[in-house]
Amino acid sequence: MPRSYDNDLEKKSVADIIELINSEDKFVAYAVEEKLDDIKRLIESIENQMKKGGRLFYLGAGTSGRLGILDASECPPTFGVSENLVIGIIAGGDKAIRKSQEFAEDSLTQGWYDLKKFNINKNDSVIGIAASGTTPYVVSTIKKCKSKGILTGCLTCNPNSPLSKVCEIPVEIVVRPEFITGSTRMKSGTATKMILNMISTTTMVKIGKVYDNLMIDLKVVNKKLFNRAIRIINITVSYTHLRAHETKANL
């Protein structure tokens, strides 16, 4: 059912449009909150698999795939883990990160082929990301993974979708209709990013990559991170700033 503001958006002022978008965005956090039990179950299962030596794969198309890649790419510098621990895969390959590869998401076989390149095994976990829950690339791959005994989860904004039905641990976030009809890069994308933050952050905490709330395993690869490492050392072992600088050669 159309909302009161759905008509004639093009006639509204900039102030009105951004106020309406912001109003809709406020519902996203509450929608995520309603699914915390499902998110908890998924994270605990991923943690168990990682402690067996498993990896985490995010699989998606379009915006969903890009969000998975974004979250995965932040894990090595933030938590000091191998770039092969959390891996984002997008339909159409790396070229789809910058330029849409619209028909890539329709393949029923490419997703499994993409995972096989990483020698996927039963210790790994795969999360399918699809706002609609109908993307063939994702649905078919998650179904295949489950049949192989691989832990499967999904993030979708469409209840009782085909994706939810074929995965082991579905997380369904109902965010209400998008501000622009069908533009799932908006609230659906925001909800997805929030949950990916929860998944990667909580998993890294539970496998020992965080002390208190500090990134104790971050990789010192630039001046900003060097200075951050100095501050972490100061906080955790009460070094003076000067004493911490003396350890630079060992960082």
Residue ranges of each PLM-predicted region?
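Cofactor-/ligand-binding subdomain signature composed of acidic, glycine-rich
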Residues: M1-A31
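Short, basic, glycine/proline-bearing loop/turn elements
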Residues: E24-E34, S100, S125-G128
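A short, well-structured juxtamembrane/interface segment
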Residues: E34-N48
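Glycine-centered, small-residue-biased loops immediately flanking beta-strands
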Residues: G54
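Glycine-rich phosphate-binding loops that contact phosphosugars or nucleotide phosphates
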Residues: F57, A61-M194, T203-V205
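Internal, active-site/partner-interface "lid" segment
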Residues: T201-I235
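Conserved small/polar residues in nucleotide/adenosyl-binding loops
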Residues: T240-A249
